[in-house]
């Protein structure tokens, strides 16, 4: 493993243990050149979850993109940022398929937001469902109100 401090090509493993989440191995390493220590994480390389876009093309799932959408919807709302992060970064692990349609990601995000905050839910729905009129927006709010 290349040293991040001096770029020497060799290091030795000083300590190795499972990470807190159990999904990776945490290794403490020591550079054989400069003797500085650093931490690396080893994780299994899985096939990426592919997202089928509305227009047809496929792209690898990006949890940061989902997190950005959730963060925008919850901006200035009393929603725990750690909950958003956990949902976005745990999303790929929860999907038991190699492909998912972008519409399904939106549905699952709305299901996640619904019990957390009504305003965030409506904000996300307005983008996800692509409201084209005020009437459509009002319909969604009425539906939300009826479910409460």
From Swiss-Prot:
InterPro entries: ATP-cone_dom (IPR005144), NrdR-like_N (IPR055173), RNR_NrdR-like (IPR003796). One of its GO terms (biological process) is negative regulation of DNA-templated transcription. The keyword Transcription applies. Its cofactor is Zn(2+). Pfam families: ATP-cone, Zn_ribbon_NrdR. It comes from the Bacteria. Keywords: ATP-binding, DNA-binding, Metal-binding, Nucleotide-binding, Repressor, Transcription, Transcription regulation, Zinc, Zinc-finger. GO terms for molecular function: ATP binding; DNA binding; zinc ion binding. The keyword Glycoprotein does not apply. Residues 1-22 are annotated as: Disordered. Residues 49-136 form the ATP-cone domain. Negatively regulates transcription of bacterial ribonucleotide reductase nrd genes and operons by binding to NrdR-boxes. Belongs to the NrdR family. This is Transcriptional repressor NrdR. It comes from Deinococcus deserti (strain DSM 17065 / CIP 109153 / LMG 22923 / VCD115). The lineage of its organism: Bacteria, Thermotogati, Deinococcota, Deinococci, Deinococcales.
């Amino acid at each position: 493993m290349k040293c991040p401090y001096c770029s020497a090509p060799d290091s030795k493993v000083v300590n190795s243990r499972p990470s807190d989440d159990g999904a990776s191995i945490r290794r403490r390493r020591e550079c054989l050149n400069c003797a500085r220590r650093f931490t690396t994480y080893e994780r299994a390389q899985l096939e990426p979850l592919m997202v089928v876009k509305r227009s047809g093309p496929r792209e690898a799932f990006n949890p940061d993109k989902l997190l950005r959408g959730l963060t925008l919807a919850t901006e200035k709302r009393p929603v725990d940022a750690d909950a958003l992060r956990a949902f976005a970064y745990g999303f790929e692990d929860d999907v038991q398929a190699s492909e998912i349609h972008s519409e399904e990601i939106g549905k699952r995000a709305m299901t996640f937001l619904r019990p957390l905050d009504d305003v965030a839910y409506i904000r996300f729905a307005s983008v996800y469902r692509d409201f084209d009129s005020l009437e459509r927006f009002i319909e969604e709010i009425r539906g939300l109100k009826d479910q409460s």
